[in-house]
Swiss-Prot record:
Sequence positions that bind [4Fe-4S] cluster: C406, C409, C413
E.C. no: 4.1.99.17
Taxonomic classification: Archaea, Methanobacteriati, Methanobacteriota, Archaeoglobi, Archaeoglobales
Catalysed conversion reaction: 5-amino-1-(5-phospho-beta-D-ribosyl)imidazole + S-adenosyl-L-methionine = 4-amino-2-methyl-5-(phosphooxymethyl)pyrimidine + CO + 5'-deoxyadenosine + formate + L-methionine + 3 H(+)
Protein name (record): Phosphomethylpyrimidine synthase
Protein encoded by which gene: thiC
Length: 425
């Protein structure tokens, strides 16, 4: 019995109770949302301890951090440190996207330090295990999914929405960058070389059988996410939206939790349309977005471009933000890049929660308490309430004022001046 099937029977497990407490909502309300597929609560049956993180309607906006090796840079312990730092900075989930080294050993090592939901993209390993990507057979697509499920992976990105219809849309498109999704590119390359349908799409029911056995949440990958502003909102992307909506229905029918992934690079004026379209065609499935990045020229600062897009997407209904680091488009991120990426995404997530139904009051209470601390010039309380207490404290201490205010205004602190004026009046 999967968690979504339990929810449909009204069963409130201890795990659900903990998740509801974390979200500040009633457990009965949470299981209703899970039962409809509006919220997912990822947890593989083989993982004993996972901090509950509900994703979707009425729940707080969550942040995912990607870690993992590349073929050019394999330092497992650095990736472990990234996973630790990401969680310390507030990441609600961690994904291992390793593509270099002993992928089984790396995945298991990173999982040892991850306490929140843990995700992977299995096709990366399937591709690495073969001499050439196109040499995979159809069974390879599924064997690797089962391997990850047995290892305890809580959620997996699988590009099941790619099929011949969408490939033909891509072929006729005027895209500048084509496909920028690694999983999508692997799948499309395999299809074109072997002249066969995507196994994940063709045998989706079989895929769901594997996932259901371990209660793995499927994250339906967006192979056609736009990789630049020029490519945003084209027919290939919307074709995939529709396919993903149909797959969401199948997931719910089979009792498998699912969420849907989205773009990408999107200009500000298209974000709301894109998000609302995805929410509509997927019947309010939890929406997991990479950014979206609102410009292509922010190299070195793409975490900021992504946070801007994420905040706007959250206003329209996005539920889960995949962080972007300053190294995006440039290099494998460092530990510090990971921390900065999580912080930027957490700022966007909190900004979303300030207006999100079910979370607004709780989120605004924190801002209210910060304002009180500023009114009282209570610096320790301000540090405590900050997204990044360590950095706030370090900056304040860098140039201290002789007054109780900060060194920006010193004895001309506006709050202090007006307060003292009223006290003298």
């Amino acid at each position: 019995m999967t968690l979504i099937e339990d929810a449909r029977k009204g069963v409130v497990t201890d795990f659900v109770k903990k998740a509801a407490e974390y979200e500040g909502i009633e457990a009965e309300k949470l299981i209703r949302l899970i039962s409809h597929g509006y919220v997912v609560l990822p947890k593989n049956v083989r993982r004993e301890e996972v901090q509950p993180r509900a994703i979707g309607m009425l729940t707080s906006t969550k942040v995912n951090a990607n870690v993992g090796t590349s073929a050019d840079y394999i330092n497992v312990e650095e990736e472990v440190e990234k996973a630790i730092i990401a969680q310390k900075a507030g990441a609600d989930a961690v994904m291992d996207l390793s593509s270099g080294g002993d992928l089984d050993a790396i995945r298991k090592r990173i999982m040892e330090v991850v306490e929140v939901p843990f995700g992977t993209v299995p096709i990366y390993q399937a591709a690495r295990d073969c001499h050439r990507v196109v040499d995979m057979d159809e069974d390879d697509f599924f064997r690797v999914v089962e391997k990850h499920a047995k290892d305890g992976v809580d959620f997996m990105t699988i590009h099941a929405g790619v099929n011949w219809v969408s490939v033909e849309r891509l072929r006729r498109s005027k895209r500048l960058l084509g496909v920028v999704s690694r999983g999508g590119a692997i799948t499309i390359g395999w299809m074109l070389h072997n002249e066969k349908e995507n196994p994940y799409y063709k045998d989706f029911d079989y895929l769901l059988e594997i996932l259901k056995e371990y209660d793995v949440t499927i994250s339906l990958g967006d192979a056609y996410r736009p990789g630049c502003i020029h490519d945003a909102g084209d027919r290939a992307k919307y074709t995939e939206f529709i396919m993903l909506g149909e797959l969401v229905e199948k997931c719910r029918e089979k009792g498998v939790q699912c969420m849907v992934e989205g773009p990408g690079h999107v200009p500000l004026d298209q974000i709301e349309t894109s998000v609302r379209a995805m929410k509509s065609v997927t019947d309010n499935a939890p929406l997991y977005l990479l950014g979206p990045l609102v410009t292509d020229i922010a190299a070195g600062y793409d975490h900021i471009a992504a946070a801007i897009g994420a905040a706007i997407a959250g206003m329209a209904g996005a539920d889960f933000i995949c962080y972007v680091t300053p190294s995006e488009h440039l290099a494998l991120p460092t530990v510090e890049d990971v921390r900065e990426g999580v912080i930027a995404a957490k700022i966007a997530a909190h900004a979303i929660d300030l207006i999100k139904e079910g979370q607004r009051e709780r989120a605004r209470q924190r801002d209210y308490e910060m304002s009180l601390a500023r009114k009282n010039l209570d610096w320790e309380r301000q540090f405590e309430l900050s997204i990044d207490p360590e950095k706030a404290r370090e900056i304040y201490s860098r140039r201290k004022s002789e007054s109780e205010a900060c060194s920006m205004c010193g004895d001309l602190c506006a709050i202090k001046l007006v307060k003292e004026a009223f006290e003298r009046d």
